[in-house]
Amino acid sequence: MDVNPTLLFLKVPVQNAISTTFPYTGDPPYSHGTGTGYTMDTVNRTHQYSEKGKWTTNTETGAPQLNPIDGPLPEDNEPSGYAQTDCVLEAMAFLENSHPGIFENSCLETMEIVQQTRVDKLTQGRQTYDWTLNRNQPAATALANTIEIFRSNGLTANESGRLIDFLKDVMESMDKEEMEITTHFHRKRRVRDNMTKKMVTQRTIGKKKQRLNKKSYLIRALTLNTMTKDAERGKLKRRAIATPGMQIRGFVYFVETLARSICEKLEQSGLPVGGNEKKAKLANVVRKMMTNSQDTELSFTITGDNTKWNENQNPRMFLAMITYITRNQPEWFRNVLSIAPIMFSNKMARLGKGYMFESKSMKLRTQIPAEMLANIDLKYFNELTKKKIEKIRPLLIDGTASLSPGMMMGMFNMLSTVLGVSILNLGQKRYTKTTYWWDGLQSSDDFALIVNAPNHEGIQAGVDRFYRTCKLVGINMSKKKSYINRTGTFEFTSFFYRYGFVANFSMELPSFGVSGINESADMSIGVTVIKNNMINNDLGPATAQMALQLFIKDYRYTYRCHRGDTQIQTRRSFELKKLWEQTRSKAGLLVSDGGPNLYNIRNLHIPEVCLKWELMDEDYQGRLCNPLNPFVSHKEIESVNNAVVMPAHGPAKSMEYDAVATTHSWIPKRNRSILNTSQRGILEDEQMYQKCCNLFEKFFPSSSYRRPVGISSMVEAMVSRARIDARIDFESGRIKKEEFAEIMKICSTIEELRRQK
């Protein structure tokens, strides 16, 4: 029988059909090769938007810099970065006027945080530009390298462990005439392989000392490394994103802390909250506008899009904002916060790996590193690339491009949101002093604008005024990409609003399925995703039950763990059948051991091991939860773990799931091939760092300590902790006298070794 699909929707309100429009099946596009071209695009575009500004030269680095601030007022609709300082300051003043005490209170909160933050805050985050090796590294390694080099250059304030003291070292390092660094270099040599007796090229890595003069060091300290943003859907071209080095990160963190504190107090800000909390906050603004537009007023909403938000923002503007926000605060605090925007006004963009050339006839490939672009003959490049390189050449120093205007992606999300909200705030009737007024929502570069007025002309006038006000602070609303609708239907940060936010369940589809971490985590993540979608995304009970059955099926195929009594043959079925036959209580077997599935939509919150524990045979319990099992490389699992789930749109989300450590919580071993490459030294550093941290955690399990505040080193802290614990254990009879004596002896030996060092 043929079914007319439109009949399915007869009874469905149109907003509930949004999940059927899901466009994102299949994998998102990833970038390959070099990001140099995208970075040059960014640099050239940013300068083009500010081209009528003033050129100056940085006296320290010799970098040419373009300053568009207080430049010409716009005469057309082209995007531009000519923000007017007095307009930004006035917007800030009005914002404070509408929210008395907001800046004062946020400054006090931030000041407290600044004094308490530990330097290990900077180990969060993924890839970070490591200025010592001139490439990206995991954040923890980059920080360790920076601190190590600071100390060897006599900068020791960081030893207190406070972030603010580390930043003092950063400031001092910029005044030094030279910095001595340890860097890696590659050696290739031909050796005879013992086994095959053939000649092979062996790559080794060496460490060497290198002196950087003030200019070279400053360039590195101000460098943002660039990469291509991956997995961006709905875009034809890739684009570049930046990762700053350790010198900049700490300062940015404090500025963002202040801005976050302000955003929390602004009802129009879509940051820093997320999920349902964000929806509730936004729904309030819409409700306010709709209630106020009684029968006499029209209300329209613009689903807004800004042209190149961060390329038209300017760090000098952020400096003006911070100067205003902190105007009554202590000098030290104002200085700390103004350094990030100053560093960004002098930033350098690293052009990445450079270009790869290959000659088909000669079967040759060669890489042109970014450092060579300044003086290579352009005849090798195609027209498009030629133009890019010609344009960027005046800005190049040592393979980095001077990029004073613009912000690079994702650096000051909170602070730029404050700027956006300050313009939305100007829409109150008491400020517009006319019949139209506006309000809206802002989340980084995304906005929704709600305009109320007695008639259509008023709406048009309100939109125009908003548009022009934005231009004055370097925000360019795109007339092509924004669209206007009667209030009640709009989109904001991928939330669709139609008389309330619509649950767009299809956006979560990519996160359903088996993650591929290990049997234990995958089961837990799978059921948690279903549970969360029942709570947050209108996933109904019948659909959830079906999702669960599909998940279990998927899981069994992934790990080849079909039920012990099944006919399906896989390479595990022989073992699983044997286990099934030996087991008295078959319901107690985990799904990954060929057991039945006991999950239904009522018990998704219980980890599988707990769900089946009472049903398990005793010897199975003993095998399953056996920390001494030699075949499992065990990690100690906290009661809650974090998984990264990918929605179809927007950033990867972190999701908590319950983790019960069993012999199924294995961790795959690291690929051995890395050990023969140049990365080996780095890997060893990383492992040593990891070992130290793990050891420290053993002495101070997170439940029992507040992070040590004080100047003792990690070793001193552990030794004193060991002595205290040993004494308590000895006095309560948990350890014998000999053991106590041995512990004390080891502690003394460690201290002695430290003194000799």
UniProtKB/Swiss-Prot annotation:
GO CC terms, sorted: host cell cytoplasm; host cell nucleus
Domain RdRp catalytic: start-end pairs: 286-483
Xref: PROSITE patterns: RDRP_SSRNA_NEG_SEG (PS50525)
One of the GO BP terms on file: viral RNA genome replication
Record's comment on post-translational modification: Phosphorylated by host PRKCA.
Sequence segments annotated as region (Promoter-binding site): 249-256
Family named by the database record: Belongs to the influenza viruses polymerase PB1 family.
Protein name from the UniProt record: RNA-directed RNA polymerase catalytic subunit
The organism of origin for this protein: Influenza A virus (strain A/Goose/Guangxi/345/2005 H5N1 genotype G)
